[in-house]
Amino acid sequence: MIYDSQVYTVLLIALLASVLAIRLGSTLYQ
């Protein structure tokens, strides 16, 4: 079974990873 806490944790990790990737990409682009 998948608990809501696990889903939220995965979503938070994915969100943080996307934000870090965007910041890294923008830094390398500059």
Curated annotation (Swiss-Prot):
GO biological process annotation, one example: photosynthesis
UniProt topology in membrane: Single-pass membrane protein
Major subcellular location class: plastid
InterPro entries: PSI_PsaM, PSI_PsaM_sf
Membrane spanning residue stretches: 7-29
Keyword Transferase: no
Homology family: Belongs to the PsaM family.
HAMAP family: PSI_PsaM
Name recorded for this polypeptide: Photosystem I reaction center subunit XII
Gene designation per UniProt: psaM
